[in-house]
């Protein structure tokens, strides 16, 4: 199973929408830049029919070095989470098991 890259997304926009390659690449970059800016500003990103990007604060917690067994603290941090929307879930589930 491969991965869809930003370059491939730009190529698809070029092929399907008739944008030139530079415009397609800029469009993809701007899309992700808007998501980054919103998250940096503590905003939730809601993409209708796709899902939501949220920020979550995690508290410090105890951890363990797997090699030595030594206890080490895992520092508090903010993480980005993604929750797929119902439409995306339904489409993915509809194709489950149809491709190797």
UniProtKB/Swiss-Prot annotation:
GO biological process, one term: regulation of DNA-templated transcription
Molecular function as annotated in GO: DNA binding; structural constituent of chromatin
Chain positions covered by the region annotation Disordered: 53-72
Gene3D superfamilies according to UniProt: IHF-like DNA-binding proteins
Entry GO CC: cytosol
Alphabetized InterPro entries for the sequence: Hist_DNA-bd (IPR000119), Histone-like_DNA-bd_CS (IPR020816), IHF-like_DNA-bd_dom_sf (IPR010992), IHF_alpha (IPR005684)
Any Pfam family: Bac_DNA_binding
Keywords: DNA recombination, DNA-binding, Transcription, Transcription regulation, Translation regulation
Record note on quaternary structure: Heterodimer of an alpha and a beta chain.
Task of the protein: This protein is one of the two subunits of integration host factor, a specific DNA-binding protein that functions in genetic recombination as well as in transcriptional and translational control.
Classification via HAMAP family: IHF_alpha (MF_00380)
Family per similarity comment: Belongs to the bacterial histone-like protein family.
Name of the protein this chain belongs to: Integration host factor subunit alpha
Organism listed in the record: Pseudomonas entomophila (strain L48)
Gene this chain is encoded by: ihfA
